[in-house]
């Protein structure tokens, strides 16, 4: 497949309003691709270059992209930036700039889908002091051979933000339709492999094998997620439940085979070198080959410390030993996904818990059975007294469903409801906040698109505001007056008093009295609130269901 064909598919998808029509279009393309092209196309059309579990990262920021395009077009970086500010879209701006170049130059080489992928692999492999120079050289070569339409989607792909509405759910359904398979079978394989590109290839080569796909050590899967809910509703719906403390820590996944172990964050990053104490504790705690799910909790004098202490340990590459002395982390393991060559994800929680107790023992988080709301609320009160966030209320026969935010697991916390939202823009401040960002535009995800739900300015101290400016200043993609568009990479936890319907935002909803709680450095965009889950929260709110 030529990259131009891929760009044309994306252009058609971008102009298609209906979800089913989009699925039809992608499903029609998939069978025409060869075995090498198929997984690459599937990832690309979702705006991704590598599988979620892969440690490969492009490492391309807006400035590198601006420099590459400026070089190819024969202009200055500021001209590229101005074009992006005018259009509000990196892809459209690059397309326009390349259209001017096209009138005065000849193409050197046709871009092929696989050639683009191999060049992006080369970009990701660049390391050391000269890595940025090598990445720039690769980007210049790609844009130098790109037609304007190709440039639109190449620019977005480099920033891994395609904006055409093909999220995982749509692509999963397209794979099922293309190869005439039950979508549940495709979803099962996707949960285990964590790569729809590989799933698509397997669906064509050996569809019968999809049902037998299992998770593998050292290939992290997405973590099962919880919805906000109530103790009373969970017990009313399911009878006996398992109640666990909700820790103010950071999720991790521990993989072990023999004497080799790795730890992955909830963003699926390898953080083993940052957490040698956690690795050693769990390595010594079991002789079995396992994949465990748990939470790293900071403690001082036996009492839990806030999340901010935990995150200072994650992804730290320097002075790890000195930071270990300052901040003690303990693992609280609450689930087991894999044991001695066998996946346990499809087994009920009660069985998984029994296996966990048998193979680990130490460092297992306490779990309490409850059959009535009074007993569960007593555990909830105890959790708060101990300094924890609240409780998790889990259905005992629930399977482990990677990446799914469902009601089989419910989180219960006191006070204001919170949402994890993607920061997609900001507005320059005034008065005391002049010279920095004063408010931030927040969005929910919906099948590859990010839809705004409001702005937050309240709850941000001057000190935090300075930290946020440092965090975002190099993530600015476009400017328009006082407003800027940001790379959608950072997640805010935001409190609110009410969800309202609103014509002012593309999502159709707005938050009443939004308040900044914290940056969720441990969370990826894929783990943020979806439009569907926001609508469900709105429905529960209208029905008068609270958070306790």
Curated annotation (Swiss-Prot):
It is an enzyme of class 6 (ligase). ATP binds at residues 244, 251, 266, 295, 334, 405, 411. One of its GO terms (molecular function) is ATP binding. One of its GO terms (biological process) is DNA recombination. CDD domains: Adenylation_DNA_ligase_Arch_LigB, OBF_DNA_ligase_Arch_LigB. Keywords: ATP-binding, Cell cycle, Cell division, DNA damage, DNA recombination, DNA repair, DNA replication, Ligase, Magnesium, Metal-binding, Nucleotide-binding. Belongs to the ATP-dependent DNA ligase family. NCBIfam families: dnl1. DNA ligase that seals nicks in double-stranded DNA during DNA replication, DNA recombination and DNA repair. This is DNA ligase. It comes from Methanoculleus marisnigri (strain ATCC 35101 / DSM 1498 / JR1). The lineage of its organism: Archaea, Methanobacteriati, Methanobacteriota, Stenosarchaea group, Methanomicrobia.
